[in-house]
Swiss-Prot record:
Gene Ontology BP annotations: D-gluconate metabolic process
InterPro entries listed in its UniProt record: D-isomer_2-hydroxyacid_DH (IPR050223), D-isomer_2_OHA_DH_cat_dom (IPR006139), D-isomer_DH_CS (IPR029753), D-isomer_DH_CS1 (IPR029752), D-isomer_DH_NAD-bd (IPR006140), NAD(P)-bd_dom_sf (IPR036291)
EC class name: oxidoreductase
Catalysed reaction, written as an equation: D-gluconate + NADP(+) = 2-dehydro-D-gluconate + NADPH + H(+)
Protein family according to the UniProt entry: Belongs to the D-isomer specific 2-hydroxyacid dehydrogenase family.
Protein name: Probable 2-ketogluconate reductase
Residue positions binding NAD(+): R158, I159, T211, I238, S239, R240, D264, H288, I289, G290, S291
SUPFAM superfamilies to which the protein is assigned, alphabetical: Formate/glycerate dehydrogenase catalytic domain-like, NAD(P)-binding Rossmann-fold domains
One MF annotation (Gene Ontology) recorded for this entry: gluconate 2-dehydrogenase activity
Length: 325
């Protein structure tokens, strides 16, 4: 009997290719750009699609119309804002993602942005490379402390909890959090305190945004919210770029509403060279690499492959997104 066919939108480790090949016929797209017409042609026979929630195609009605046999879209990412949930349900296509494997790694990155922004690591690296060491008074290079300060976390999911542990037990910080639902068990085990969003913004020295992108969270941090923050605050976003009004963030940095920012995500990715953020010294910029370690990316890819194969074989994948559970 002919094995089912699956399409993979970007290169994956050879070991995982071999694993998929034991159960399916497959094709891996090797180029940087995947034209829509090519994708649609590949999907004519595909029962599974392995892709990414950050760099993969939008799973919308147009795509699904070209994929009559599709059973599952497996994201190699935690986020799945590329899913049109309603359209997928209408077609009987389930969606999966890869939570759990990256929680600690992304929390580590969050703290690297907090520390880098507080101590101006990227800015002062450029300062030294430009031969400016010794040209200004030392006070001009001062940063701010992280330990014993207040961290406000917006979105107390698994990554938020790991970030809170680092803050509380590693840096002896006061930790406030805001979440859709209060989490008493987390409050008891870690010692964090729930706060309304405005209170968190007003009282925190560092603000960490780790919320999924939904209709409700689109531009949830804008001019009003930045003006509520301390002018000494540092804002860090590792969620999705569109949770923040980027124009308001740029003004906040330019006009001193806040001290600085650390960003791993942006409204438009990759960032274009005319983005004003690139001209600002008080922001640390990363290229959306929250989970980017070799071990974690391998584990995410393996989990995505297992999710896809389970759905194709008529089993319930371990990591269905909540809308398909």
């Amino acid at each position: 009997m002919l094995k089912p066919f699956v399409f993979i939108t970007k290169p994956i480790p050879e070991e995982i290719e071999a694993f998929i090949g034991e159960h399916c016929r497959y094709e891996v797209w090797q180029e940087d750009t995947l034209p829509s017409d090519v994708l649609f042609e590949k999907l004519k026979e595909a029962e599974g699609l392995l892709t990414s929630g950050t760099s993969g195609p939008s799973i919308n009605r147009e795509l699904l119309e070209h994929a009559p046999k599709l059973k599952v879209v497996s994201n190699q990412s935690v986020g799945y804002d590329n899913f049109d949930i309603e359209a997928m349900k209408e077609r009987g296509v389930v969606g999966t993602h890869t939570p759990y494997t990256l929680d600690d790694t992304v929390a580590d990155l969050a703290f690297s942005l907090i520390l880098s922004s507080a101590r101006r690591v990227a800015e002062l690296d450029r300062f030294v490379r430009a031969g400016k060491w010794g040209t200004v008074e030392e006070e001009a290079l001062f940063g701010i402390d992280v330990h014993h300060q207040t961290l406000g976390i917006i979105g107390m999911g698994r990554i938020g909890e790991q970030a809170a542990r680092r803050a509380k037990f590693g840096f002896d910080m006061e930790v406030l959090y805001h979440n859709r639902h209060r989490k008493q068990e987390t409050e008891d085990s870690i010692g964090v305190k729930y706060a309304e969003l405005d209170t968190l913004l007003e009282q925190s020295d560092f603000i960490l945004l780790i919320t999924p992108l939904t209709d409700e969270t689109y531009h949830m941090i804008g001019e009003r919210e930045f003006k509520l923050m301390k002018n000494s605050a540092i804002f860090v976003n590792i969620s999705r770029g569109k949770t923040v009004d980027e124009k308001a963030l740029i003004r906040a940095l330019q006009e001193g509403w806040i001290r600085g920012a650390g960003l791993d995500v942006y409204e438009k990715e990759p960032v274009t060279q005319d983005n004003p953020l690139l001209q600002l010294d008080n922001v640390t910029l990363l290229p959306h690499i929250g989970s980017a370690t070799a071990k974690v990316r391998f584990n995410m890819c393996k989990q995505a492959a297992e999710n896809m194969l389970a759905a194709i074989q008529g089993q319930t994948p371990k990591n269905l997104t909540r809308e398909f559970q």
